[in-house]
Structure formats: C-alpha cells, structure tokens
Amino acid sequence: MSNLFIGELVSLSIMAFALGTDAFSVGLGMGMIQLKKKQIFHIGVVIGLFHVMMPLAGMAAGHLLSGFLGMLAVYIGGSLLFILGVQMIIAAFKQSDGPLISPAGSGLLLFAIGVSLDSFSVGLSLGMNGSNPFLAVTLFGVFSTVLTWAGLLAGRKVQSWLGSYSEALGGAILIGFGLKLLLPV
C-alpha cells in the first residue's frame, strides 16, 4: 500500500466517522421510540445505503453545482430533522398507541434523507478533489450504519429508563440537531 492510499484512507475514515456521528445523534433520538432489534437493523442498513448514495450523487454532480446545492442540502436536512422532532414531541403527548412518524416506510425514508443530506455536500467537495469514490462511499456506508445502530441501541436503553417521556426527549434531540443545521454558528 502506498503512503498516498493510506493517507486517503485515514482522511476518508475521519470524514466518515464525522458524518456517522450525525447518524448516531439522530439515531439516539429515534431510538427512544420502542423499536425491535429487526427494526434497528433495518434502519441502520437504510441509513448506511443513503450514506452511500448521497455522496455518490454529490460526486457525480461535481463542482458545477456545489455552491448552490451544498447549502440547500444542509437546510433541507435540517428542516426534515426539525419536522421529525416536532412530530415526535406531538406524538409523545398525544393519547395514541404509536408514534406519529413510524421509523418504517415513508417515515424511514424522511429520516434517512434528513440524516444523509450532509453527505451529499461532502460528496460534491470530494468529487472536485478527485477522491477515490469507491473507498469514500464504502467507508461512509459502514461508519454510518454502525454508528446508527449504536445510537438506536443507546436510545432504546434510555427509553427504558425514561418511559413515556423518552419520545419527547428524542424529539427534542432531533429538533436541536435540525436547528444546528439550520442556524450554523
């Protein structure tokens, strides 16, 4: 292995971990909904796939659109996470059996898009720098999948401690993360 490849591997691994921590944080909030292990596995895989597809799409888009779509992707992702958080808080205080947004079907799709939109922007910049696309998307997918699982499992544990208030706390975490994206400091 050449030093150049090792340098790129380390750089992309650090970047993949950073993007995956977003998925961990949001997974922590979503994990406070009562989830089965099969659902946790499925959610992690879907998030991982989106963390492969989004940067790949970003790399394909290249530098032509990076200035406009880069910030737009961040704002869309922040808005989706904010909306999911509000809906989770509403569901926590509503007298119903299930969450307002289910982490399956269209709810999972919104969740995955919201969490992975920042990786689209990263893909745009990686496309301009000529990074190895296969290595980048593989690392992004693996890190985000594993960190999503960790967040969901940790959220599940917190849910067992907090009971019915855990979904409201999960919603607050998603709102906070969405606001962080919408209102950069």
Swiss-Prot record:
Transmembrane segments: 4-24, 40-60, 64-84, 108-128, 134-154, 165-185
Pfam family, one: Mntp
Membrane topology: Multi-pass membrane protein
Record flagged with keyword RNA-binding: no
Cross-referenced InterPro entries: Mntp/YtaF, Put_MntP
GO molecular function: manganese ion transmembrane transporter activity
Keyword Hydrolase applies: no
Compartments where found: Cell membrane
Keywords, ordered alphabetically: Cell membrane, Ion transport, Manganese, Membrane, Transmembrane, Transmembrane helix, Transport
Disulfide cysteine pairs (residue numbers): none
One Gene Ontology cellular component annotation held by this UniProt entry: plasma membrane
Entry function: Probably functions as a manganese efflux pump.
Family: Belongs to the MntP (TC 9.B.29) family.
Alphabetical list of PANTHER family matching this protein: MANGANESE EFFLUX PUMP MNTP-RELATED (PTHR35529:SF1)
Protein name according to UniProt: Putative manganese efflux pump MntP
